[in-house]
Amino acid sequence: MEVKAKQLDSVNATASVKIPSGMIKSEVENLAKKASKSVKMDGFRPGKVPVSAVLKRYERELTQDAEQNLFKSAVNSALQELKKESKELVGEPYFEKFDRKDGEIIAELILSFKPEIKLDGYEKLIPEYQTPKVNKKEIDEKKDELLKRFSTPEAIKTKRALKEGDFAKFDFEGFVDDKAFEGGKAENYVLEIGSKQFIPGFEDGMVGMKIGEEKDIKVTFPKEYGAAHLADKDAVFKVKLHEIQELKIPELDDEMLKKLLPGEEKASVEVLDEKLKEQIKNEKLFKLVNDELKGKFADALIEKYNFDLPKGIVEQETDMQMRAAFNTFSEKEIEELKASKEKYQEKRDSFKEEAQKSVKLTFIIDELAKLRKIEVNDQELIQAIYFEAYRYGMNPKEHLENYKKQGALPAVKMALIEEKLFNDIFMPKTEKSEKASKKEKEDK
């Protein structure tokens, strides 16, 4: 096997590899000999399977394993020549060229190493911003939202028509082609008008009804309706309204304050307002950071700091972005790309600049996290994945296993580190500015 290594820049090197067919064949035979001692095959006793039988049945798999072993050996030889260690590598070696002729393999690999980055003066790049302000109206609206969670529907005493936001207690029976259908009947059913729990048109048809009124409401079941025999069918619902209910919002008395402020010794409206103000401010700041500040800061970091990028990582990121974009291509565009290598390469190259920015930012964030001592432990990683699973109604353990199988845990961890990092950068600044503003008021 011939291996020639060449350093391209501070973080990239090439390894030109030539593997003779005889070496591949020899490695395949060695693997077959080892496998023959443990493989189970009908007609043979354990440990007595002939090598020829193993080769015949598993030649393809053995060849793949043999080539993989030889390339690992080639990479180790290249690292020795470059005076590098395997732990310095980032990502997998990237095949820039791979040719097979008469059993011989000729390949060109890109080996990439982690860049050294100095982020002197990064603090000056943190964008300036105003601490979000919270007014009384916003606090009152948030308070109303909280109180609504403890509210209960109660029958109204005044005579008026049903309107959106009311709760209606009514009987109904549905008919398709003048025939009642299963599951289309109920008595004393309670429905919030405007909640869109029923099929389109039903709740709108009830608006304006009065207590005791009977009405036929005509609707059409959606094409995608769960019960196939009703999908896209016209129907008539005979409805009788018994009661109109309104949400009764509880008063903000001492008992309610204790519910809204559990564990607070001196529960009061003032304490609640202060906590709601802080909550709203943090929500606004979170939105500001994610919608504006994070992007500005990232762009400034990318523009200011220049260093050699690991080519293999950039190529892998480009491939990933290209694959993701395939979902947005039209069938015609996909066919054109499959038919023309030039068009495919041109399209792929269009993602290169964005891939370079993404890789660059990843290394910058990694270095920033180290500077600011930001870490994410295994427990935090698992909790984040479990929380995601619960949000989407998935099995948390299976969700975690899927991430492991896809090799996606490092990406999830990096996303969590990034979130922690930006919170660390922007949130303390808010606290400092708040203290400064309070001091200013005191001085005045």
UniProtKB/Swiss-Prot annotation:
Recorded catalytic activity of this chain's protein: [protein]-peptidylproline (omega=180) = [protein]-peptidylproline (omega=0)
Q: Which residues cross the membrane?
A: none
- Species per Swiss-Prot/TrEMBL record: Campylobacter jejuni subsp. jejuni serotype O:23/36 (strain 81-176)
**Broad enzyme group:** isomerase
GO terms of molecular function: peptidyl-prolyl cis-trans isomerase activity
Q: Which domain of life is it from?
A: Bacteria
> PPIase FKBP-type domain location, by residue?
165-250
Q: Which family does it belong to?
A: Belongs to the FKBP-type PPIase family. Tig subfamily.
Q: What is this protein called?
A: Trigger factor
The answer, when asked if Cytoplasm is one of the entry's keywords, is yes
